[in-house]
Amino acid sequence: MNPAEAKAVPISKEMEGPHPHSKKRHRRQDAKTEPEKSQSTKPPVDHEKKAQEGKPKEHTKPKSTHKHASDGEGKHGRNEKTASRSKEPVTPAKRTEPETKPQDTKPAGGKSVAAGTTAAPGKAGDPKKEKKSLPAAALAEPKPDEPSGKSGMDAALDDLIDTLGEPSETQEDSTAYTGPEISDPMSSTYIEELGKREVTIPPKYRELLEKKTGVAGPPPDSVTPLGPDDAIDALSSDFTCSSPVASGKEAGKEAAKSAGEVLEAESAKVMRAAAPPQEKKRKVEEDAMSDQALEALSASLGTRMAEPELDLSSIKEVAEAKRKEEKVEKCGEDDETVPAEYRLKPATDKDGKPLLPEPAEKPKPRSESELIDELSKDFSQAKSNEKQPKPTGKTEESKAAVPAPVAEAVPRTSMCSIQPVPPKPASLQKSTVPDDAVEALAGSLGRKEADPEEGKPVADKIKEKSKEEEREKLGEKEETIPPDYRLEEAKDKDGKPLLPSEPTAQLPALSEDLLLDALSEDFSGPSSASSLKFDDAMLSAAVSEVVSQSPASITRATAPPPDTRPSNKELDDALDKLSDSLGQRQPDPDENKPMEDKVKERAKKEHKDKLGERDDTIPPEYRHLLDQGEQDKPEKPPTKKSKEIKKPAGDQDPIDALSGDLDSCPPAAETSQATEKDKSKTTTASSSKAAKHGDKAKDSAQTTEETSKPKANEKNAS
């Protein structure tokens, strides 16, 4: 510190203290008696202010208050007070000085200042004792009277300044940290790349390089590394004389220069202190000795051989095999690669069959009539109601114009193929139907009924289609019949098949005209033969009807052409007379039954031999019981069914049957009987057409007849 600053600090600190009244007195005395000292202390104060600007502003509040007071007074004493106040919290050593000065400042003059400066360093170590002694000394001081020359404004300002008190001292926090130890575990490590230096090359790769290029590897590391002291002792043992060492140094330097300064051994720089202690002198000497040994060692090594250049021509590029892209199936990409445990199992029903997905319901397609109804429902209905009665009359007239069909009942056998279609009236064919009639007719028609098959889902149609597929049944062809169940042909003794005894003569195919001529030539008898008179056209029509009812498809005759056809009235009369002569047809009970009932009845009519139904099937143990029971019972008369059932006549061609009766011309009574016989024959032919399974029914009837006959014989025998 400057001596001026050292003098200025105690003067300014003298005025500060715990008792403001004592400060006032000393300030006033100093201001009056020593104005020169206050002027001399101003430059150091300004210097200290500049020094404090760089420091942190800890006490801003006291500065502002003291500046305000100094502006009001405008005196040198006040300026000194503000300078001393602002300079207070600089160092803890300075804070202790003003506490000790009030006791030493009793004598006035520069001696008190010098005593304060000398006493400060000695008492700096006991700040607590000084604080305790201050208040007692301050109370013991007598209060001198205030000067009469001071105004009341200054006294008021002094009192106001005294009420502010001293700025609080900032004590530095000197408490030691007792928390956990903070450590930074992160550390940077340098990892050298493989092969960057020769040391980092792996041994196996080094062998390959030595074989190809002949480069020798680095020398192997020593097993036990020597310390610095051991190396110095080993090297310095040979250097007992100083002269060879010097010569060795010179030789080493010359060799290093001649080799182009390939290898240079630098001595380690030693940082020497100004006055090293006695303990470190020995270590410095050892370092100097080690430098000399290293230089001698480097001189003895000689020059380093230059590395040979690599011959790049001998290096061959390694040709790697070209890689091909192969598609590898991933697990789960296909169904086959999915493990069995993870496969999705389809939903099955009770029988284990997979459930078909329910088809989505498709909207039903609307018909034209429905679309027309929807489009026309918004129109007014008054016009349609008015127009409806008009076409009804027209339709009734048109219906009346159509000729009514024949009212008389004609048997089906005679009216099957020759009934003429009523011709359409010319008025309906030529005249166009008016629009009003069409609208009325469309309004009277009901809505189209939905087709039940139309709304069925696709799955049902597929099922129905599969049901309609035809398949060859077992036994339908001879190839499908097992060999054990095939019919064996009749063979002679030599094993040759027997030929039919009388080969059937094939009749030539006759045309319709020849058949009609053959049938009509026998009707040339006398008029007394029959009471009916027919024209040739009527007769041909009647004969064609009979021929059309025959089972032979070739002999069916169609109606005559329209040019030769007679009038409808005459034909109807002829047919009526012919139908009257035939008599009424007996209805066939099996004709109107559905196909399912026939199949069921046929299944019921099939006969199977039951146990005990015949004598052959009765066990011998139970035969005597039946014999005893039959002796007690009276004999039953033969049933009516057995009498009525007769063997049906053999099938005969209806044409032959008809033509056989027409060879002779019997009387009228005989002709009527013949017509009745013809009627019965034609009915049998028609019934054979209606019932396809008639042969099986006959077989069942024969079996029942045969079974009834032995039973009746047994009863008669018993």
Curated annotation (Swiss-Prot):
Residues in cross-link Glycyl lysine isopeptide (Lys-Gly) (interchain with G-Cter in SUMO2): 32
Task: Give the N6-acetyllysine positions (modified residues).
Answer: 49
Inhibitory domain repeats sit at 170-222, 307-359, 450-503, 587-640
Q: Where is the composition biased (Basic and acidic residues)?
A: 30-61, 68-104, 320-331, 342-377, 384-399, 446-496, 566-579, 587-650, 706-718
Q: Which domain of life is it from?
A: Eukaryota
Family annotation (Pfam families): Calpain_inhib
Task: Provide GO CC annotations from the record.
Answer: cytoplasm
What are this entry's molecular-function GO terms? calcium-dependent cysteine-type endopeptidase inhibitor activity
Q: List the disulfide bonds.
A: none
List residues, modification Blocked amino end (Ser).
Answer: 290
Phosphoserine-modified residues are where?
86, 133, 222, 243, 367, 369, 376, 444, 520, 531, 579, 581
The Basic residues compositionally biased stretches are 20-29
Q: Low complexity composition bias: which ranges?
A: 114-124, 400-411
Outline what the protein does.
Specific inhibition of calpain (calcium-dependent cysteine protease). Plays a key role in postmortem tenderization of meat and have been proposed to be involved in muscle protein degradation in living tissue.
Q: What else is known?
A: In erythrocytes the protein lacks the N-terminal region of the liver inhibitor but retains three inhibitory units.
| Free-text domain note | Each of the four flexible inhibitory domains can inhibit one calcium-bound calpain molecule by occupying both sides of the active site.
Family membership: Belongs to the protease inhibitor I27 (calpastatin) family.
Report the protein name in the record.
Answer: Calpastatin
- Source organism lineage? Eukaryota, Metazoa, Chordata, Craniata, Vertebrata
